[in-house]
Amino acid sequence: MTCSLLPSEQSSGASFLPKSNASFPWGSLDEDELDDSLLEFSDGEEDDGHFSFTEEEIEMLLKDDDGGHNEYRPRKSQILPDIPQENSLYSLGPAAETPGFLKLPQLSTSVGHGPTPSKSLNRHFVLEKNLIKVTVVAPFNPTVCDPVLDKDKIDSSKETENPASLREQTREDDPQPNESKRCTEPEGVSPNTSAWDGPLLSSPSNNNIEQTASDKNIPESKKPTPVFSQISNHSEVPNRKNSGSHKSGCEVRIPVVSSSSNRHAFDKDSGEAKGERRLGKVIPVLQTRTRMFSQSELEKQKDIYLSKVIAHIEDPGDSNQGTLGELDALMDQVHMQHPDWQHPSDLTTRNYARFRQRPLQRYSLSQWVDRNKRSHHRFQRLPDFSYSPYVSSHQQ
């Protein structure tokens, strides 16, 4: 019988090869002469799965697989040990040691739509197979489960009134215990549905039926809240008396929380929505102030203004223009008494002589032109002063 090494065993078996550089004659070896001692358990090592077969059992399984599923099912019940339903899904107990623990060349089982690849019957296959069984949901008969669920919905409202009578009524409403048991317990493996061994998981609705039957024996104050009801009633107060629902697990409703930020925060004190606080430039709002004026004061100011205008029209020099007029009159008087004093309003008067040591020299136009470089390019476009004989003689 041919055996194939796993990748992990091939890597570990490479250390047993000779370390010489000479090429090893692999072609001289025969497959029948391979040592199967690597596949056996070492001292103190035990199998942690429930699928330990001998060579005779493996050959029988291959014959049954070729013969059909009808012969395979009674043989499977004799070979496979009886496994409890509760411990088969999550526990992997140790099994008896089997010296002839080999890998099957091909184990074709029809699951789904196509054949699965061959798997070795070792601990890796046991772990992978048990993980697959956990994810498979057992089929159930809806014609049997639906009436039971409908009766639980009706009887849940009367649960607080008379739990003892409800317990008796539940027993009377189940005329076929074998069929109702199929709702709460998974069906056995049949050749028409699947070829997986062992029990399968029950549906969420079946777990709900078992929980309903167990809750009827517990007082209302001590009943634990189920897990799916805590999720579905997250935003509501958990009240089993007024809920009146033992719904299927597929009808669990989860509240959706909006992730968008609220632009208006609700003020609990005033009951109004606050605007979003923004940082930036604050534009002040001008507040209007009311000023009170007496009618008599307005008439008095009006008379003063009219009298000033009329006086200025009649005699502009002698008219008093207020404070500014008084200042102008004072400066005129000082300038008349002291001619050397420059009037502040005389902006055209240039009196640079008082800042110089030498007296101011006066020049004619031609002299000024000669002193300021007549040949300069700035004066090239100036016209000739032909009207002056002095300038014309200078040009010649």
From Swiss-Prot:
Molecular function (Gene Ontology), one example: calcium-dependent protein binding
Matching InterPro entries: S100PBP
Endpoints of the signal sequence: none
Transmembrane segments: none
Keyword field contains Amino-acid biosynthesis: no
Pfam families registered for this protein in UniProt: S100PBPR (PF15427)
Cellular component aspect of the GO annotation: cytosol; nuclear speck
Keyword terms, alphabetized: Nucleus
Compositionally biased residues, Polar residues: 202-215, 227-246
Annotated stretches, region: Disordered: 145-249
Compositionally biased region (Basic and acidic residues): 148-161, 168-185
Subunit-level organization: Interacts with S100P.
Record's protein name: S100P-binding protein
The species this protein was found in: Mus musculus
Organism lineage: Eukaryota, Metazoa, Chordata, Craniata, Vertebrata
Gene: S100pbp
